[in-house]
C-alpha cells in the first residue's frame, strides 16, 4: 500500500513559500507535474495556508520580509497540528551556521539556490516518502495497541468469570 501511494505522487500536497516570483515559478515548474502545489509569497500567508491546507511538505525560503523562514518554522513546530510537516529550506544562504540553525529549528533538509531540479525532486520525494511511512507506522502502532488492550480486557473478563466457578466441587480451582 505504501508503494502505491508514493507512486501516485500527485496525491501529495506541497506548500512553496518564497517572496521572489521567479523562484516560485521555477519551483512550480519543477514540482507541479508531480504534486499538488500551493504558493505563499510571505511567511504570514504561509502559516494561514498551512493551517487550512495542512501540506505534506513545505519548501521554505529563509530571507523574506516580515516573518523570515526561521520565524515560520518556529511557529509551525510550536503548533501540534502542524509540527510533523517536513520543512525543507530552499535559500540563497549557504553558510554552515544558517544550515545548522535550520536543522536545530526542525528542518529536514536544506537546498541552496540556484536549485537543481532533479535534486529538488529527489529530496522532496524522499522526505514525503519518509513522512508517509512514519504516518503509516503510527497508525499501525495505534491499531495494534487497541487490539492488545481489547485482548487484555477479554482476558481479565475471562479470569473474572472463572472466579465465579471457584467452588468446593472443583477443589477451589
Q: Which sequence ranges carry the predicted segments?
A:
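Non-catalytic signal-transmission and effector/linker regions of two-component phosphorelay proteins
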Residues: 1-15
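Alpha4 helix (beta4-alpha4-beta5 surface) of REC/receiver domains from two-component response regulators
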Residues: 25, 52, 71, 83, ...
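Helix N-cap/capping motif at the beta->alpha junctions
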Residues: 39-48, 69
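Receiver (REC) domain active-site loop signature in two-component systems and cognate sites
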Residues: 64
